[in-house]
């Protein structure tokens, strides 16, 4: 289980997309945008956008649309991006290092405080001035540095055990890149990320037309 939300996850997953696009509009000095224009860019209906935003009070004006800066600022607060969060990465392999090197997270308020691994050869390695440390010290580090989010980038065999350790140490949110769906207490926020899911979606779309041609042919044979 994981901490339940008051708004559907489908809505929550669309909010970062709205926020990202509004940021681009601001950079291009766009002052306002209609629901229709926003829907064309987002690939969802104008009605859906209005429903999504109405969960938080609604921000548009009839006949005017949305003030881009105002909506962006409101979404920043809704997403909690007006605050800062202390994070750690568990696993200093290729994926862990890639996430550590992604500077946009820090710009959004996610401050990387430590990286942990089981491999002694990696201890002392610095990634953007953040040192790789022994995983056996993680509980003390979490307590001393008031860590909010643990980012798991380790093989699935150790993922649940490690997640349990983080939870016992006081972590309240886990961003999990390990290829396994973790289980955590109800008061802990968990986001399981399977990178292959997105790639498999691409492969499906590449094969969709061929798939339905075959299905249509098989249906025709049955009907015949």
From Swiss-Prot:
Main localization (coarse): cytoplasm
Residues given in the record as NAD(+) binding sites: 91-96
Keyword NAD on entry: yes
Gene3D superfamilies recorded: NAD(P)-binding Rossmann-like Domain (3.40.50.720), Winged helix-like DNA-binding domain superfamily/Winged helix DNA-binding domain (1.10.10.10)
Recorded family membership: Belongs to the transcriptional regulatory Rex family.
Subunit structure comment from the entry: Homodimer.
Name of the protein: Redox-sensing transcriptional repressor Rex
Organism (species): Thermoanaerobacter pseudethanolicus (strain ATCC 33223 / 39E)
